[in-house]
Curated annotation (Swiss-Prot):
Entry's family note: Belongs to the ferredoxin--NADP reductase type 2 family.
Swiss-Prot/TrEMBL catalytic activity: 2 reduced [2Fe-2S]-[ferredoxin] + NADP(+) + H(+) = 2 oxidized [2Fe-2S]-[ferredoxin] + NADPH
UniProt enzyme class: oxidoreductase
HAMAP family recorded: FENR2
The keyword Flavoprotein appears for this protein: yes
Protein residues bound to FAD: 33, 41, 46, 86, 120, 286, 327
High-level lineage: Bacteria, Pseudomonadati, Pseudomonadota, Alphaproteobacteria, Rickettsiales
InterPro entries: FAD/NAD-bd_sf (IPR036188), FAD/NAD-binding_dom (IPR023753), Fd--NADP_Rdtase_type_2 (IPR022890), Ferredoxin-NADP_redctase_2 (IPR050097)
Annotated protein name in UniProt: Ferredoxin--NADP reductase
Keywords: FAD, Flavoprotein, NADP, Oxidoreductase
Pfam families recorded: Pyr_redox_2
């Protein structure tokens, strides 16, 4: 059995920043993640997607953000347990025992849940025979945007993923159609502004008021995407790629049975220290819910700092935390 101060469940950007924050406070960390590599959705779903709201970076690719966060945490020697889920929790007065799907046992004083969307998968559009085109002409996640060079692409959806990928791929695609059932998009205001600006050039065509209806192709190769509006008007869009972005199915998995207050696959926490209803267990990032919650990476970073400062006295048996600025702490570590 391993013995540590903090167990962090999830190795996305918020989980990695929590490793750094814990290290700055002198806490040892073990990290559990169901994926084979660290990085969460940033690596698994959109490694090449640019993120625009990280301080000091006008834009940064998701995979580069993870690389930098991993490097920032590395001096504190975290132990990663990858390709396994946290499955069982045993509570004791002043510590927890966690068991994983690979029978790894870890004893820890504090648990930080930074599981993002939990176990995730795409919400697929209800189109007949869609499976025949998946992986060849239809993709729900983008790991390598170069495969779309010179293609005619239908992007479907109205949120951040759909709008951001339409903008990004417009730089290399021959033509982009963005299909959305409404006239208004729910993506970030600046992203929508960029989208409409590019649409004026003709590089992106906004097909609003329409929904996906059918597919036309042969041997897994798409030739066109058929869309329909509320009046049953049909349009055939010449395209060899379809990218549906209708969000993710969220599933807390075994965590749902650990006794937390759960609301719509999110763990409820207080909005001071982000502690769950179980003392010593915190939830941060997208998995956490509280009044006023903003689902931003930078919000998760702040939650990591607050929760770990609050956890300090539990880890060190009631010892008061003497606050220091990061300059002094990190230079001492180096």
């Amino acid at each position: 059995m391993y013995n540590t101060d903090i167990v962090i469940i999830g190795s996305g950007p918020v989980g990695l920043f929590a490793v750094f924050q814990a290290g700055m406070l002198g806490m040892k960390c073990h990290v559990i993640d169901a994926q084979e590599v660290i990085g969460g959705q940033c690596i698994t779903l959109y490694p090449e997607k640019h993120i625009y709201d990280i301080p000091a970076y006008p834009k940064i690719a998701a995979k580069e953000l993870i690389k930098q966060l991993e490097s920032q945490a590395a001096p504190f020697n975290p132990v990663y347990h990858l390709n396994q889920q946290a499955t069982e929790l045993n509570k004791h007065d002043d510590f927890f025992e966690i068991k994983t799907s690979k029978n790894t046992l870890i004893k820890s004083k504090v648990i930080i849940i930074a599981a993002g969307a939990g176990a995730f998968g795409p919400n697929k559009p209800p189109i007949a025979n869609i499976e025949a085109f998946e992986g060849k002409s239809i993709f729900y996640f983008i790991n390598d945007k170069s495969k779309f060079l010179g293609k005619n692409i239908v992007v479907a959806g109205g949120g951040d993923s759909a709008v951001d990928w339409a903008i990004t791929l417009s730089e290399i695609a021959n033509k982009i159609y963005l299909v959305h059932r409404r006239d208004k998009f729910t993506a970030a205001t600046e992203s929508v502004r960029q989208l409409r600006h590019i649409a004026e050039t003709g590089k992106i065509e906004l097909v609003t008021g329409y929904q996906l209806n059918n597919l036309d192709g042969h041997n897994s190769e798409l030739r066109s995407v058929i869309v329909k509006d509320l009046q049953n008007n049909i349009r055939k869009l010449d395209a060899n790629i379809l990218l549906p972005f209708f969000g993710l199915k969220q599933d807390l998995g075994p965590l749902a049975n650990w006794g937390f207050n759960v609301r719509l696959q999110h763990i409820e926490v207080d909005n001071y220290y982000y502690q769950t209803n179980i003392k010593g267990i915190y939830a941060i990032g997208d998995v956490a819910h509280y009044v006023g919650k903003l689902k931003l990476i930078i919000t998760g970073f702040a939650e990591a700092a607050c929760s770990l400062h609050h956890a300090y006295s539990r880890v060190f048996d009631g010892k008061a935390l003497h606050f220091e600025y990061s300059t002094n702490k990190y230079e001492q570590k180096q």
